[in-house]
């Protein structure tokens, strides 16, 4: 709690001398209102740059797309983007996967700092209220230099609502209902900007029952309840801005155990989790010379309790994290450069009756610098980052026996990126990027020793693990015309000391972390056709091949590699700008997942997944009254034909017996009501 008081005191001291100023300059920390890639601004590389000037593969999920999407959490909302997938445990717990890599190989950024919970766990989701997310930036590969270790697969940057224009106030009331799991989702938002004093407050609540499908019926233990409160108070002045943000998030998800009776019917599950995530962030930007000095300091506390039957407490973790980031960004003529330091301090405590990982302390610091130069036909970009991480694990005696031993490890690593964009013609672009990534093994991989409730296994760490190092090469082509836009993004990624969890024997539940060399290659293709103005035919294809080198056939493929995926959406804009209705559309979508036969079969770790195809239907409109938007209404039907299927990335596929299928048909209706005050 001391960290919270320090941040609050720092903000008060900063703002007090300028509270009497009357400037009304509004300085947005980022701009992401445009949906076209050429106009989108991205912030997760090393500063702020246009996406069209980034050699590294990057995509942006625009605010309207998030509004039109029916999902159960923010990862579920972006998991249909090319190259992005999700590992799920039921309908309420999702973990992001980028080009076949997930867990601690992806950094999720929220409120400007990296989100730190217990992301090493299979059934540990991302503790973020989806209602607070305005847009999402997806960086693929280790090209980002701002976050150091763990950003090997990429970065998900969750952007909050932009600051309101000067002199305006707005309230928003929203609600959504989904039929399959009877989920109700409510949110209330109040934001404004008066005389450069800016604020944004939001409350959200989500209640969901057990989801169901045609084969398993009701999936006991898949229910969840979520509550969140977030706020921002700040100053926008001619010298820059200072924003103080806070959030508190609480979710109570059930844990699907998958046990069945003699008739094959699923039995009720009493296991569940309680997770609390509290955060406070001081975000400052000062205009100095021809650039800006940006500083962020944040404190997070993540508390995770896992209960078994009869409310018996098992695992109980409390994680404290202090994040810091100071960097300078300058743009002059055709040059842009940035340099800074960032890192974090962590302390994790074991407070439960059962133990999986030891208590530990971690300190992480990194320094980075990057430069970009624009020419008539070329954009050249490059940068380096050096990281140092110290980890100390505490010993623990359990019933007179040593459960965890005391040990310390130090890790050092270099991250780098060198890329170019060549503008072949006004319609064609080519992108090249070579990047080097680094990831230190996490405490779970080094020191686990216990049964993990909800994962169906006993996990064993490996003290001898070394850091992962990767080299990734990206090649991309963009084409844009009046009737056709297309993107091709190809990659190859070689990882040394790739860490994975392998089953020790075919009939047991013991798993241990191992390491080896891996190679991933694949890419994404997007083709959008607009033969007539109101009709859009959008297609994507994603593929990744992930293998371990120098391994026998049964352990050749990396576990949890996404199946090849083809998506098509046919959308018709019925009314663009009517007297009462605006942006009215109807859309028919298809998701085709090909057979995944590239599986890690050693000791029955994985099984093949057959192909399946899902159809979705959606519609939406804005409603106007006297020329002003008074409501937005969206209708979504997913898995329209109620197909029984198991995703290759669903952990419930490996529940007892035949496993458990994903959600059946689901119809959702969402209403958003903006109120300008």
Regions found by a protein language model. Give the residues of each.
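Short, acidic, small-residue-rich periplasmic hinge/interaction motif at the N-terminus
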Residues: 22-67, 103
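Extracytoplasmic beta-strand/coil segments of soluble accessory domains associated
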Residues: 58, 75-114, 134
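Short acidic/polar hinge/loop motifs at secondary-structure boundaries
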Residues: 114-140
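Short strand-turn segments of transmembrane beta-barrel domains in outer membranes
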Residues: 160-192, 219-222, 270
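Outer-membrane beta-barrel signature, preferentially recognizing the C-terminal barrel domain
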Residues: 263-283, 405-423, 429, 436-487, ...
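C-terminal beta-signal and adjacent terminal beta-strands/loops
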Residues: 438-439, 494-496, 537, 592-599, ...
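Gram-negative outer-membrane beta-barrel transporters
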Residues: 491-494, 513-596
